[in-house]
């Protein structure tokens, strides 16, 4: 594995990639879900590909993907534009053809040498995704930045991008990446045509809040535990792996009526919420929350949106508890609260969020240390994006974002599992890791039984 100091990346001057054809010059409003304060940040994504001569016929991946990007922008032309604010800070896109920022780079390294440094929290993110001056803002800046780094000694490449989250959620970004990939493989148009129609998620006039939204409520007199005395320099990131063994041990800690009805995501979320709260040493009487980002698309949540809709279409309903019962009760207590919160998500809930954002002047989610937000990216589909070199060896968010953790699919040795990056103050991180190791440790008698069953 390569030491961090050894990697040297050579970058060419950034270029603006514009749509391959003329596109409409117009102004487009974002939806009230897109427009919330919570989404005014840029999210980094990394996609790593091995060389595959049998598929790519020795083509130059930078040239192929850059040209495909330009052609895909004919359909996704708002992504090549810039945001501005209107009255009451309402976001809108000025469709004036400025382009996406594209950086070509190279490094004398192999993907094998990089090893787990490609995984979140990616310690080489600044090398894979250069923060070009003037590109990191929300207003008047490129909505997408792409850096392609070719790994000269192995023929593979790393595509890293940074997306202004007000424009797309994970499902919307996947539609865009899939369109680029299809065109890189020779398609003349995306198989799913993009749909803007952000007015579908505008609040009605007059807006009316019909659901409880704990995720936007402020907690009076919160303490934050060890979060309160921490600054950004004291925050550390670390990833935690949940494989078959960890899930087997956790499932033995929940009551039978929950074993068959809870998902892996539910169980991991309950576990993180409980033991993160313990690690932060939060006041026992304080309310603590965890929000699960829930996609509104699909039959389950019954939100009627076109197939090609690529705007933000999710909510993050919050489970809430006092810290003391959360920490003292068995894991099933947290699990039931997580399941109950997720079950509130439907079309009425999403539209009630839009109404709340308009009525209350676009409130920020609670940003205290007693709050955790989790997003399941294991089924987002980033691992299926094929530009002509096969599927990526890794694809997904590059790191956690303060209070937000992304769950990503990861193969550890021979098994598929879930990797969860977490951001915490350094002292709390040590306690959190110790707690996780303790509660996912398999009892000795179970280890012996598993060895006997394996040898039979």
UniProtKB/Swiss-Prot annotation:
Top-level taxon: Eukaryota
An annotated GO BP: alcohol metabolic process
UniProt-annotated catalytic positions: 165, 386
Tissue specificity as recorded in UniProt: Expressed at very low levels in the skin of ripe fruit.
Pfam families: Transferase (PF02458)
Molecular function, one GO term: acyltransferase activity
EC number of the protein: 2.3.1.-
Keywords: Transferase
Entry-linked InterPro entries: CAT-like_dom_sf, Plant_acyltransferase
Its job: Involved in the biosynthesis of volatile esters which confer ripe apple fruit flavor. Alcohol acyl transferase that can use a wide range of alcohols as substrate to produce esters.
Misc: The fruit of cv. Royal Gala exhibits a high ester accumulation, whereas the cv. Granny Smith contains low ester levels; this influences strongly the ripe apple fruit aroma.
PANTHER family: ACYL TRANSFERASE 4 (PTHR31147), OS05G0315700 PROTEIN (PTHR31147:SF66)
Family, similarity comment: Belongs to the plant acyltransferase family.
Name assigned to this protein: Alcohol acyl transferase 1 allele GSc
Gene that this polypeptide is encoded by: AAT1-GSC
